[in-house]
Amino acid sequence: MEVKVSWNGPSGMSFRAETGSGHMVVMDGAPDGGGNNLAPRPMEMVLVGTGGCTAYDVVLILKRGREDVRGCDVLLQAERADTDPKVFTKINFHFTVTGRNLKQAAVERAVNLSHDKYCSASIMLAKTAEITHSFEIVEV
């Protein structure tokens, strides 16, 4: 896996990243750090990637289990250390899984498998942060 990150220049603290799969992402800093607040912060992108990783797992596991999943949202709420390097210390993942006749046990299994076995991003973050997760099922 490869990503190239480039600073956009001396007028701020924005960066563009090109992924190995050919996609572009822009990041920016807070105004108090010289940024213009025009894009997500790099640490927000860590949460974005982690949320995408675990939501992907949950949907895939449910689909493979032939569950009629129609939607999956995950809200990540995180706390960071007060001192540098300001790592994440707590992250809560709350899943809202939408579908028809979804089994509670199947959703719980999918969430647990993602966090315990498959989502490399959340497993890495668990080395420094207390990870908790919850879910709700919405019938459609």
Q: What are the residue ranges of the model-derived segments?
A:
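Extended beta-strand/beta-hairpin segments
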Residues: 1-48, 59-140
